[in-house]
Structures are given as C-alpha cells and as structure tokens.
Amino acid sequence: MQGSVTEFLKPRLVDIEQISSTHAKVILEPLERGFGHTLGNALRRILLSSMPGCAVTEVEIDGVLHEYSSKEGVQEDILEVLLNLKGLAVKVQNKDDVILTLNKSGIGPVVAADITHDGDVEIVNPDHVICHLTDENASISMRIRVQRGRGYVPASSRTHTQEERPIGRLLVDACYSPVERIAYNVEAARVEQRTDLDKLVIELETNGALEPEEAIRRAATILAEQLDAFVDLRDVRQPEIKEEKPEFDPILLRPVDDLELTVRSANCLKAETIHYIGDLVQRTEVELLKTPNLGKKSLTEIKDVLASRGLSLGMRLENWPPASIAED
C-alpha cells in the first residue's frame, strides 16, 4: 500500500467478539503509530465519565426516617438496602424522571422483579436482590425515584437543592453511566511492508441497559462532536466594545451655581447669560472685567475656583454648546 507521506491510515472495524450480552471486545486496525493510545485513552475516559443513563436517586421506605436505621423483619440495614438499589439497571423510554413502587411481604428475597412499573420502564436485571425478609409477617414498601443523567453524581452534591425535602426521603449516590468496566490494549499491526502500526483492542462491560457496541458508538460520537470545533478553527472572540468618550468633560455641562461663588459674582455671570461652566471658561479676563459690577476681586475668586477644578479662563471648546444644552 503506497500513499502520500501526509496521508493517514483510517481504521476499519475488524472484529466484534461478543463474550456475553453485556460484555464485548472490539478490535480496530490499522492505526498510525501512537494513535492506538491516543484514541483508546480518549474513548475510555468518555465511557467512564460521560455516558448518559438512568439511575436511582431517591428512595422512601415506609417506617424509615433516615438511612442510619434498620427495619423490623428486614435482614439488611437501610444503608445496605440503598447500596443494593444503586445496582438496579433500568431503561426508561420517553421520560427523564419516573417513580417506581415496590411492595413485598413474607419470607424470602426482595428482587428487582418485584418492582411495579409502567410500559416506559424496563428492569434489565430482574434477579437483582434488594433485601431479604426474615419473617412471615414482615413486609416492605418503598417508592423509588429514577432519573436520567450522566456520569456519577454523589448525593452530597444534590443536598443544596433538597433543603426542604421531607423527612424519610433518602438520597442515593447516582451512578448514571451504564458502563461498569472499560479497558483497552494496543498491539502491533502490519499492513503490507509497514510493521509499525497499532491495533486497538477495547474490552467493555455494561450493566445491560446499553449494549457494549452502542456504548462505544456513542462515546465516539461525543468525541467527534467535541472535536468539530477544531476542524473549522477561527477567532470567535467577541469584538471589543469601545466606550464612547463624552464630547465634553461632564464638569463643563454643570451650571455655574455648582461653583458656589459669592452672590455678587454669581449674579454678574447670570446677567451676562453665563449659565454653564462651559460658557464661563470660554470667556477671557478682559471680557469678564467688562461685565457690570464684576471687579478684580470677583475675577480672582472665579479664577481660583476654576483652578481648583483643573479649569481656567480663555479655553476654546469646539462645537459648544452641545445639543442637549442648546435645546434647553
């Protein structure tokens, strides 16, 4: 097989070894050298942490107020019962949140098949033992909440949303992922004269809620969707929004009354229709001294007050007055 030095080999599905209904081995080859570990590790991490599924999240057991207790006639303590419920494998169609019920009495094991559910729910492991009743008169009733989610979510991370939950509603660590075990191995592969290629062997076990091949297919889809953003890589940063600087310093738009001049000086300025500080700073000393009743003492006062604000007489302001003042 002769090709361009820049052309990468694409793997093809070589074999699916179905060990059981929940256990399979998938072999992919050929892969370029190093790609076996690159792809195998990425798929393994997604399969372990990011696969969606359904899990028990809350339980209510008649006569039980908290998980650190026991129930008469039940061999296991409540913590062990909750642990067994975590092992329940459930498929739910068309819903993200369902309530299941269980009612059992008499001596013997209580199994997943004893759970009552509607047609949208399938118990994958009906023989899974939840607890044992040890007395003919013993009974147990519970309401089991099953929700759809992703990965593993401990009960402690959900307590902040359950501050007002009723007494007796027990939270369960939710293991949504249907994948129970995943391992991969990279072996040597050969294509014609090339002997430096990889063969990826993925071995996967699920709880039965999802077939192993479908789990790998979904993990590969998730990985491909995440990498799509890099295929058409471009700068997607938001353009900088430049703040428009005001045309005039805000202090120039304030009335001369804000300068707190003496009554004499203020009245002289108003008589000359000088209403804003912007009007005042454009006047020269000579112009102000021509104002009736405004002498050198008042002029000095005005100059000092303007100087304290970083202003002075004789300034030139383009486009004065602004439209907001001109309209007034």
From Swiss-Prot:
Reaction(s) catalysed by this chain's protein: RNA(n) + a ribonucleoside 5'-triphosphate = RNA(n+1) + diphosphate
Gene Ontology molecular function terms on file: DNA binding; DNA-directed RNA polymerase activity; protein dimerization activity
SUPFAM superfamilies: C-terminal domain of RNA polymerase alpha subunit, Insert subdomain of RNA polymerase alpha subunit, RBP11-like subunits of RNA polymerase
Presence of the UniProt keyword Transferase in the record: yes
Region ranges (Alpha C-terminal domain (alpha-CTD)): 248-328
GO biological process, one term: DNA-templated transcription
E.C. number: 2.7.7.6
Record InterPro entries: DNA-dir_RNA_pol_insert, DNA-dir_RNA_pol_RpoA/D/Rpb3, DNA-dir_RpoA, RBP11-like, RNAP_asu_C, RNApol_insert_sf
Gene Ontology CC, one term: cytoplasm
One Pfam match: RNA_pol_L
Region (Alpha N-terminal domain (alpha-NTD)): 1-234
Source taxon at top rank: Bacteria
Alphabetical keyword list: DNA-directed RNA polymerase, Nucleotidyltransferase, Transcription, Transferase
Similarity annotation: Belongs to the RNA polymerase alpha chain family.
Subunit structure: Homodimer. The RNAP catalytic core consists of 2 alpha, 1 beta, 1 beta' and 1 omega subunit. When a sigma factor is associated with the core the holoenzyme is formed, which can initiate transcription.
Comment field on protein domains: The N-terminal domain is essential for RNAP assembly and basal transcription, whereas the C-terminal domain is involved in interaction with transcriptional regulators and with upstream promoter elements.
Function: DNA-dependent RNA polymerase catalyzes the transcription of DNA into RNA using the four ribonucleoside triphosphates as substrates.
Name this protein carries in UniProt: DNA-directed RNA polymerase subunit alpha
Species per Swiss-Prot/TrEMBL record: Haemophilus influenzae (strain PittGG)
Gene: rpoA
